[in-house]
A protein has these predicted regions:
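Generic structural signal for secondary-structure transition and capping sites
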Residues: 37-38, 84, 132, 153
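A short, polar/proline- and glycine-enriched secondary-structure boundary/capping micro-motif
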Residues: 76-82, 166-168
Length: 171
């Protein structure tokens, strides 16, 4: 079966191996996603891309990320139509002289609407622990909680050095 989330990298390039062997790459990705509180959620619909800012929380193993959105939004509708998503998280500075220090991660995966129940409660707790101000928003019946199962991360430094990391059971 073809993975619908295949990267554009040439599989034979040593620089772009499916699983980067640098043990610090996972740690750099972890640090970045734990330090930043917001991501740009990238979705698509009708052949058009759409980006939206979301507050997020990753699972400890980096295999899942969770966010909440109102159900009466374009974001919710597009997530309901297509589960292929990406989240872009970066360390963008406010000063131009720090521009080459920017790191960015694109996490690609499949989104899942989480129905109220045990899993909803566990994931809501994860998100609220990171963003306590979202508690009433997360619990509102007019909002939906989504979990994204991460397929891979693309880590970028200095605007052109790209490596990928795939979370596994052995993270």
């Amino acid at each position: 079966m073809v993975n619908q989330d295949e990267p554009l990298f040439d599989r034979n390039s040593p620089m772009n191996s499916p699983q980067d062997s640098d043990p610090t790459l996972r740690d750099r990705i972890r640090r970045l996603v734990m330090e930043q509180e917001y991501a740009v959620l990238c979705v698509q619909g009708g052949g058009q891309p759409y980006g939206a800012l979301v507050a997020f929380a990753f699972s400890e193993d980096l295999r899942h990320v969770v966010f909440v959105t109102p159900t009466a939004t374009r974001k919710y509708r597009l997530l309901s139509e297509c589960d292929h998503v990406a989240l872009v998280i970066d360390s963008r500075p406010n000063k131009i002289d720090q521009l080459m220090d920017v790191e960015a991660v694109t996490a690609t995966g499949r989104s899942h609407l989480i129905e109220r129940g045990v899993e909803f409660d566990e994931l809501a707790e994860l998100l609220i622990a990171r963003h306590p101000y979202l508690k009433s928003f997360v619990q509102a019946t007019t909002c939906a909680l989504f979990r994204v199962d991460i397929v891979r991360f693309f880590h970028v430094v200095r605007f052109q050095e790209v490596r990928q990391w795939i979370p596994t059971d052995h993270c």
